[in-house]
Amino acid sequence: MLPRVARLNTHLVSLALLGFQITYGAITYQHPDDLPSDVDYDFIVAGGGTAGLVVASRLSENPDWNILVIEAGPSNKDAPETRVPGLAGSLPASRTDWNYTTIPQDALGGRSLNYSRAKVLGGCSSHNSMVYTRGSKDDWNHWADITGDQGLSWDSILPVMKKAEKFSKDFSNQSVDGHIDPSMHGHDGLLSVVSSYTNVSFNDLLLETTKELSDEFPFKLDLNDGNPHGLAWTQYTIDHRAERSSSATSYLESTRDNVHVLVNSRVTRIFSAGNGTDFRSVEFAVDANSPKKVLTAKKEVILSAGVIASPQVLMNSGIGGREELQAIGVDTLIDNPSVGKNLSDQAATLLMFDTTLPNTDYDVAAALTEWEDSRSGPMAYGARLNHLTWVRLLDDKLNGSDPSSGKNSPHIEFQFMQISHQLPPADAPNQVKLPDPDSIGAVLLLAVVNLYSVSHGSIILNDNDPFANPMIDLNMFGDQKDIAILREGVRSARRMFSSQAFKDVVNGTVYPPADVTSDEDLDAFLRTSAISYWHGVGTLSMSPQNASWGVVDPDFRVKGTSGLRVVDASVIPYAPAGHTQVPVYTFAEHASVLIAKSYA
């Protein structure tokens, strides 16, 4: 999640990028009536997001299989703004967003939160901040233990991540010596990754801090080596041409013509044969007023609609808790109360420090023209600042309970965003008094993130209308441990910018005000300022075969069914130490192998 850049008229962006051509082997259809009537599909992928396009691409390697992808949003070809790295901050709440809102959060004083989810081919990989983080070794080893699939352990899964990755220098061909460990990366995969950076004075000061405060903020050569603790150069899913690399631009562009993609059509339900347990028929429509169509897969349906929509589709299909389904008038075919539960996300707050450092503001329209002309300039970068920091709290700050995956996992992330004259947007929570713009020169803006929330939320349906948004309850700060950890994160950030390196250029926080220091005052600030970091997972969690909890088995099959698997963020048991993009790609790569092997 990043603060939005100045809003651009998407029509003007489209005009500016009119000559921008995107090609791939898959055949794209704009309307259900356009689908060929003489093709029987072996696999139907319900959702063309990050995971769905990976699965479709990998299955297409078998030339005898025909695959159909059904995506609710438009093609990324029709949303060229998704290709420009510097426009990432303008995509939330745009035409390529579902624009979800949570229900009022009790621990936040009844505030509802915006909950951005992508509605475009490529899903969140076409829409996110492009940060490339794998999580910790502890995360993967713990996921392997709790799912019963040792194929997810770090040592087993690292080759999968490397296989998918194509690390290279960025458009500027700058050296990455001292920025990454080349041995930790793949160089021949489909997904482009760079470690692009700008030469701002802030970089040098941060690196000085890693020497002065090395216990809390050590320098980390590569944030993706499995032990993410310290300050590191950020890596992004951007290619060497300074364009976003998404599942649509990487995986889909490499597919064959045995993949058909239907955009602008929403999967509403998955039907079973004779109301039994074999689910292979997909119902879909353009909108609530359009006729519904049904297609049946010869082999399987792969549900890949995301952490919000996948449980919604299952519940509307009769898979969920019996009492909940009865309450909305849906017949229960598979009674599983775990469906829609266990929503795991990360809580964050923005911090602003008064600073005399040079600002990183730029003219967005001029920068877009520069990018369009030469694929260079501010729009070519993933962010205006170049580092992430991960902090592991001391045991005495955890009150005897460690929510992380293990001793090599951090509790807190700092994502440095920009140095700007702009204050938070008008729609940001501002019950805490914002500074007078005339009283400060510029502000250093960063996000402080609690990576491991103890509190889990849920997805619940209001009714059986498949086009109605579900109720999203993050249950943010439902457990007091979560706000306590984020509070310590704020204090950690203040220690960083009280270091000798910053003493002459950073003058303390203005959001929250510098005098907000006690537990009580910081908690009050966090209850009015906390936001979701939009890294939700877990609503259809994977669990061991025959477990009494969870929704999918380690082979990604929905428990108690045949013909139906789920492959997306919803199956990941809890959010990792970092961003969720790479785990979603990796789970999808892993699932693709398992699916293909089952038909070998």
From Swiss-Prot:
Subunit structure: Monomer.
Organism, scientific name: Leucoagaricus meleagris (Western flat-topped agaric)
Keyword Flavoprotein tagged: yes
UniProt name for this protein: Pyranose dehydrogenase 3
Function: Catalyzes the single-oxidation or sequential double oxidation reaction of carbohydrates primarily at carbon-2 and/or carbon-3 with the concomitant reduction of the flavin. Accepts only a narrow range of electron acceptors such as substituted benzoquinones and complexed metal ions and reacts extremely slowly with O(2) as acceptor.
Induction and repression of expression: Constitutively expressed, but on a much lower level than phd1 (only 4.8% of the amount of transcript).
Catalytic site positions: 535 (proton acceptor), 579
Main location: secreted
InterPro entries linked: FAD/NAD-bd_sf, GMC_OxRdtase, GMC_OxRdtase_N, GMC_OxRtase_C
PTM sites of type Tele-8alpha-FAD histidine: 127
Keyword Flavoprotein found: yes
Top-level EC class: oxidoreductase
Compartments, record wording: Secreted
E.C. number(s) listed in UniProt: 1.1.99.29
PTM (free text): N-glycosylated.
Cofactor(s), names only, from the UniProt record: FAD
Gene: pdh3
Single GO MF descriptor: pyranose dehydrogenase (acceptor) activity
